[in-house]
């Protein structure tokens, strides 16, 4: 019997304050140590803020990426974010067991808050 590496299941949920919500893949499975990519497509606009949060069962959400690609200092370097056109991507390079969680994408239209 061949050895199969354990899989992590990363679930994506979204939140948005714009009228047309983003679309996304509902779940991603990845083997330990492999790269995981979670993408969202939405009607982002200049001046909007895009954030990614990680939430584990029974815990509060933790900001892992802000302004599309910036990472808080306490977040491991394996987490990164990127944006191309209207697609925003969260990448986990070398996924670890502790990365199994729900991931939330948030798009905030800065014009709506002024």
Curated annotation (Swiss-Prot):
GO terms classed as biological process: adaptive immune response; immune response
SUPFAM superfamilies hit by this protein: Immunoglobulin
Predominant location: secreted
Cellular component GO terms, alphabetical: extracellular region; immunoglobulin complex; plasma membrane
Signal peptide: 1-19
Pfam families linked to this entry: V-set
Ig-like domain ranges (all copies): 20-114
Chain segments carrying region Complementarity-determining-1: 41-49
Stretches the record annotates as Framework-3: 70-105
Assembly and binders: Most probably, the immunoglobulin is not assembled due to incorrect folding of light chain. Immunoglobulins are composed of two identical heavy chains and two identical light chains; disulfide-linked.
Its job: Probable non-functional open reading frame (ORF) of V region of the variable domain of immunoglobulin light chains. Non-functional ORF generally cannot participate in the synthesis of a productive immunoglobulin chain due to altered V-(D)-J or switch recombination and/or splicing site (at mRNA level) and/or conserved amino acid change (protein level). Immunoglobulins, also known as antibodies, are membrane-bound or secreted glycoproteins produced by B lymphocytes.
PANTHER family reported for this sequence: IMMUNOGLOBULIN LIGHT CHAIN
Protein name in the entry: Probable non-functional immunoglobulin lambda variable 3-32
Native species: Homo sapiens (Human)
Gene designation: IGLV3-32
């Amino acid at each position: 019997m061949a050895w199969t590496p354990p899989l992590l299941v990363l679930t994506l949920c979204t939140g948005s304050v714009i009228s047309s919500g983003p679309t996304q893949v509902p779940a991603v499975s990845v083997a330990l140590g492999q790269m995981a990519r979670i993408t969202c497509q939405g009607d982002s606009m200049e001046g909007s803020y895009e954030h990614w949060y990680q939430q584990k069962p029974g815990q509060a959400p933790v900001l892992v990426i802000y302004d599309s690609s910036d990472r808080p200092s306490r977040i491991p370097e394996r987490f990164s974010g990127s944006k191309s056109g209207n697609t925003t991507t969260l990448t986990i390079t070398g996924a670890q067991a502790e990365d199994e969680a729900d991931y939330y994408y948030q798009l905030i239209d800065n014009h709506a808050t002024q």
